[in-house]
Amino acid sequence: MSFKMTQNQYTSLYGPTVGDSIRLGDTNLFAQIEKDYAVYGEEATFGGGKSIRDGMAQNPRVTRDDVNVADLVISNAVIIDYDKVVKADIGIKNGYIFAIGNAGNPDIMDNVDIIIGSTTDIIAAEGKIVTAGGIDTHVHFINPEQAEVALESGITTHIGGGTGASEGSKATTVTPGPWHIHRMLEAAEGLPINVGFTGKGQATNPTALIEQINAGAIGLKVHEDWGATPSALSHALDVADEFDVQIALHADTLNEAGFMEDTMAAVKDRVLHMYHTEGAGGGHAPDLIKSAAFPNILPSSTNPTLPYTHNTVDEHLDMVMITHHLNAAIPEDIAFADSRIRKETIAAEDVLQDMGVFSMISSDSQAMGRVGEVITRTWQVAHRMKEQRGPLDGDYVHNDNNRIKRYIAKYTINPAITHGISEYVGSIEPGKLADIVLWDPIFFGVKPELVVKGGLINSAVNGDANGSIPTSEPMKYRKMYGQYGGNLTSTSMTFVSKTAYENGINRALNLKRMVRPVKNIRQLSKADMKNNSATPKLDVDPQTYEVYVDGEKITSNAATELPLTQRYFLF
């Protein structure tokens, strides 16, 4: 016996299926479903009169001991990831994703990958989008409240440095020395997100660098405010090669110790993460952008210049002055700030992101960037580039999957690969920590509906606690049980160096969180950056600052209007 229904009826019950497209927020981007894991007519849905009931889609015999019985199922979700746009159920067990497929009761249903039992809870995601928790790899740890703001935007991992509101932290993403690193590892016990800290990379004595790696730093930051000399950079890379950690570089804006070519000569063929590669955030003026052409450079850019708008240049001078402890009464300080703000390279930045030449996007939080806007600004850039450059190869009307996969990789899998944590986070794949963000498509990229952290709901839009229903106004983000008691430590990870992990840093500091080592970093190249591995020839005109890709000038127009803006923030 069969039953037929219209496409609209099916979508209203179970969400979109193969060939259907979903508009992302109010952007011009459409995600088209490539595959649906459901068996039509046997979809598992929860609620009164629905199929997830005892003896139906819920198996009455199984116990949690069965490896295929889920603790949590996210049902009928549209998964948008760097490698897929699919409709599926997600099975979560012990805080980790264990399957992506079809959930239900194998006794009466076909092709069941995930068993729903009496020990299984359900998050109904029909008509909703699911993405991996975002990863921000350029965080100045200035204010603990950054974690909550980021979490409510869909970011679940922070990497960077700092010790609070010190001048060093405001400027340089550095947690310097074993004492500070240990204190920040202890402070992370109270944060609702995954974290990893970078130490200070300036020292000619390798012991001063090694002791920071041994203390738990996941890498070193070489920053011009501490002196980004070729010598300091080379010594830091030597230590990184020995201990399999990453080097993040904020290069020498003033070209005091050498030019871009001197920096690259010091780097040789060794891998590093180049921060804000366009240069407005800092780095060799005016041609740091050329470093993105090198196969050993993993380039990111930060959100204050993304996307390029008619306000971008004007707001940056004051931001540079404050962030880098400059004095407006000193002409040299003004000149330093001016040298970093070039509308020509800023206008090229969006295009390089769209071409996959720049591989990542991060915040530069409270040091010119906005910690809660990484995801929003990423999709604004994607919208603007489709508007100006048209569809990417392989995309067509109501199908922007190639562009969508490129852009989501910039704040999920590529940052995870770059910093050696892709075994744990960065995508919706079996074996990874269940850091998952649920979106209503209308609010995609702006305001998540809820955030699952380590398999438990961590933050969600919810109503007044005294309301008769969960949607009683005011509806706002509220802490969920993932942020209370022992769950604060049992659902999040702290990343450390392999040597610190092997030497028992968790026991030495009595850390309760899941402590995991970074790994597989030093053999990386840009070819490992998913959907963002282009290495064209880049040139910058030293007089006009115009940017050329393989001899062709690239630029973009300053936006005067953007999606994902005012209509979402009226209240």
Swiss-Prot record:
Post-translational modification, as annotated: Carboxylation allows a single lysine to coordinate two nickel ions.
* One Pfam family linked to the record: Amidohydro_1
Q: Name one GO molecular function term.
A: nickel cation binding
Would I find Cytoplasm among this entry's keywords? yes
**Active-site residues, Swiss-Prot/TrEMBL:** H324
Q: Where found, per UniProt?
A: Cytoplasm
Does the UniProt entry include the keyword Cytoplasm? yes
Q: Which cofactor does it need?
A: Ni cation
Q: How is the cofactor bound?
A: Binds 2 nickel ions per subunit.
User: Binding positions for Ni(2+) 2?
Assistant: K221, H250, H276
Q: In which pathway does it act?
A: Nitrogen metabolism; urea degradation; CO(2) and NH(3) from urea (urease route): step 1/1
Q: Which GO terms describe its biological process?
A: urea catabolic process
Q: Where does Ni(2+) 1 bind?
A: H138, H140, K221, D364
Q: Which UniProt keywords apply?
A: Cytoplasm, Hydrolase, Metal-binding, Nickel
| InterPro entries the UniProt entry points to | Amidohydro-rel, Metal-dep_hydrolase_composite, Metal_Hydrolase, Urease_alpha_N_dom, Urease_alpha_subunit, Urease_AS, Urease_asu, Urease_asu_c
Q: Where is the Urease domain?
A: 133-571
Q: Which reaction does it catalyse?
A: urea + 2 H2O + H(+) = hydrogencarbonate + 2 NH4(+)
Report the main location listed first in the record: cytoplasm
SUPFAM superfamilies named among the record's database cross-references = Composite domain of metallo-dependent hydrolases (SSF51338), Metallo-dependent hydrolases (SSF51556)
Q: Where does substrate bind?
A: H223
Residues where N6-carboxylysine occurs? K221
One GO cellular component term: cytoplasm
- Show the NCBIfam families listed in the entry: PRK13207.1, urease_alph
Quaternary structure, from the entry: Heterotrimer of UreA (gamma), UreB (beta) and UreC (alpha) subunits. Three heterotrimers associate to form the active enzyme.
Family per record: Belongs to the metallo-dependent hydrolases superfamily. Urease alpha subunit family.
How is this protein named in the record? Urease subunit alpha
Task: State the organism named in the record.
Answer: Staphylococcus aureus (strain MRSA252)
